[in-house]
Amino acid sequence: MMKTVNELIKDINSLTSHLHEKDFLLTWEQTPDELKQVLDVAAALKALRAENISTKVFNSGLGISVFRDNSTRTRFSYASALNLLGLAQQDLDEGKSQIAHGETVRETANMISFCADAIGIRDDMYLGAGNAYMREVGAALDDGYKQGVLPQRPALVNLQCDIDHPTQSMADLAWLREHFGSLENLKGKKIAMTWAYSPSYGKPLSVPQGIIGLMTRFGMDVTLAHPEGYDLIPDVVEVAKNNAKASGGSFRQVTSMEEAFKDADIVYPKSWAPYKVMEERTELLRANDHEGLKALEKQCLAQNAQHKDWHCTEEMMELTRDGEALYMHCLPADISGVSCKEGEVTEGVFEKYRIATYKEASWKPYIIAAMILSRKYAKPGALLEQLLKEAQERVK
C-alpha cells in the first residue's frame, strides 16, 4: 500500500536533510535521509497530481536544459517536472550560442540564470568530463549568487553524466519501493545488474554504475555480472563495496549471467561499453579522430558479438527466484526481433514486463521535481502541506 500524502509529509518532516544546501550530482554523496526525502517528495507530488491537486509552486521562472547527448525519456521527464512545478523550459543549444565561440562556463552559467530556478544537464559522452563540468557550472552559480549577480541560486540536477545517472537510479528505486511495498522490504532482495549483448557500442557506464552505487545503500544483495573486460569505473565499484558493508547488504562481481540470475528477485540486463574502451573513445573524440573512432567501433562490435549468449531469455528468467524475478530496464531496450535482430532481451520477456518498465519510467518526472524542490526549499514538507491544504484543482 502506498502511503497517503499526509503520511508522506509526516515522514518528510521527520528526516534530517541538507539537500537545500547542495546539488544532487551523485547518489552516494547524499545521506540515507536525503535519499528518502527525494523518494517521499516524489511520491507526494505523484499522489497530489492523482488527486487533481495542482503542484505549481512557482508562478514564473525558467528551467534550463542542457543536453549534450540524445535523450527521449529524460528530456520529457525534465520538461514534465518543470511543468509540474510551474516553471517554463528553455533548452540551451550550445551550437547556436556564444559557447561555440569560446564563451566560458562561468559566464554562460550566469547569463542563462538571471530568472532560472533550475538547470538540468546531461553530459555523459566523455569519461572524466561530464560530472566535472556540472561541478564547474555549480561553482559558477555559487559565485554569481554570492556576488549578487543572481537573485537566486538555481537548483542543478544531474540528468546523466559519465559517472552516475541519479534521476534514473532514483526512479528505479522509487519503482522498487512501490513494487515491494517499502524500502525495508528491499533488504536481502537480490538484484542482478548484468551486461547484455547489444548490436551497438559506446553505451554509457552511468546506468549500471548508478544501480550498484544506489541499491547497495539499502541492504540489498547486489550482483554485478559482465564478461571479462567489460569493467566499470573502479572507483564506483569501490563505492558499491563500501555501501554494501555499511548497509548490511552484499556486493559481488561475477562473469556469468546465469550465476547472476540464479535466485534473483530483480534483474536488470543492460549493455554498456567497457571502461577501457570508453577511455579510448574519449581520447579519440577529443582529438576529432574519425578514422580512429570507426576502427574502435568495429573492434568493439566484434568484441560484443563474442557474447551474444548474454541474452535475457525465458530460459534465463527461469533461473530467477520462482522464475518470476522483476525485469527492469532504463529503456529503450534492444529487443531481439523487434528493435534489432539480436539484442539484450527476447520479445517474450520484454512483453511480459513491458507495463512494469513503463511504470518504472513514470517515476522519473516526479523524482526530478523532488530534486528541484528539495534544493529550492529547506522545508519541502511544509510546502506540500500547503499545497494539500489549498487543494487548487489542476484541471477545472
Curated annotation (Swiss-Prot):
Pfam family, one: OTCace
Signal peptide annotation: none
Assigned EC number: 2.1.3.-
Keyword Transferase carried by entry: yes
Molecular function as annotated in GO: amino acid binding; ornithine carbamoyltransferase activity
Domain of life: Bacteria
UniProt KW Ribonucleoprotein keyword: no
Single Gene Ontology BP annotation: arginine biosynthetic process via ornithine
Subunit structure: Homotrimer.
Name of the protein this chain belongs to: Putative carbamoyltransferase YgeW
Lineage: Bacteria, Pseudomonadati, Pseudomonadota, Gammaproteobacteria, Enterobacterales
Gene: ygeW
